[in-house]
């Protein structure tokens, strides 16, 4: 069997939709919703077709294709800049330390703070590999392909 990674296309919609149904829901990078998937594929095609180098709000989607059967067996995504169309929320973990001299006691508490510090940063999106292909090292290939893509387009 031979596989290749390539840019996702609108023609991949049905195969990606069938794979999305295998996620069990809640996987935002691969929703089991044809309309949402269509928009993601349109954004990916627009991103790959772009000829200028300015950073935009691009979403790049790659698919893992079995070249013998033409079947899409996995997918992964990258986002050039997050927080451009709507806020990108993340959490910052901090430690709050308080001391009481009267009680001679120090108390530390870990806090999560909602922040938007990562706006404008690139994001490595999720990946999904068809369950039948999970033992062949293809997950590692998909995972690393995102970083290779970013390195090629710095």
Segments predicted by a language model, with ranges:
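Conserved N-terminal entry element of GNAT/NAT acetyltransferase domains
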Residues: 1-29
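Sequence-level motif detector for i,i+2 pairs with an aromatic at +2
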Residues: 3, 59, 70-73, 119, ...
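Residue-level detector of conserved, well-ordered beta-strand and adjacent loop positions
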Residues: 6-9, 65, 79, 125
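Alpha-helical elements of Rossmann-like donor-binding domains used by nucleotide-donor carbohydrate transfer enzymes
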Residues: 15-18, 43, 145
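Active-site rim helix/loop that mediates acceptor-substrate recognition in acyltransferases
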Residues: 29-72, 77-88
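Conserved acyl-donor/pantetheine-binding loop and adjacent beta-alpha core of acyl/acetyltransferases
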Residues: 80-126
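Conserved acetyl-CoA-binding loop-helix of GNAT-fold acetyltransferases
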Residues: 107-111, 126-129, 134-150
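Short, intrinsically disordered, charge-balanced linker/junction segments flanking boundaries
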Residues: 153-154
């Amino acid at each position: 069997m031979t596989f290749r990674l390539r840019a996702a296309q609108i023609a991949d919609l049905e195969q990606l939709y069938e794979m999305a149904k295998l996620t069990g829901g809640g996987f935002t990078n691969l929703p089991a919703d044809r309309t949402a998937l269509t928009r993601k594929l349109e954004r990916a095609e627009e991103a790959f077709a772009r000829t200028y180098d300015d950073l935009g709000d691009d979403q790049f989607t790659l698919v893992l294709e079995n070249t013998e059967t033409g079947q899409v067996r996995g997918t992964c995504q990258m986002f050039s800049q997050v927080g451009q169309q709507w806020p990108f929320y993340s959490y910052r973990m901090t430690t709050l330390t308080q001391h009481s001299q009267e009680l001679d006691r120090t108390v530390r508490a870990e806090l999560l703070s909602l922040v938007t510090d990562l706006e404008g940063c690139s994001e490595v999106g999720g990946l999904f590999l068809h369950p039948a292909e999970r033992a062949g090292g293809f997950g590692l290939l998909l995972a690393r392909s995102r970083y290779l893509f970013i390195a090629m387009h710095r």
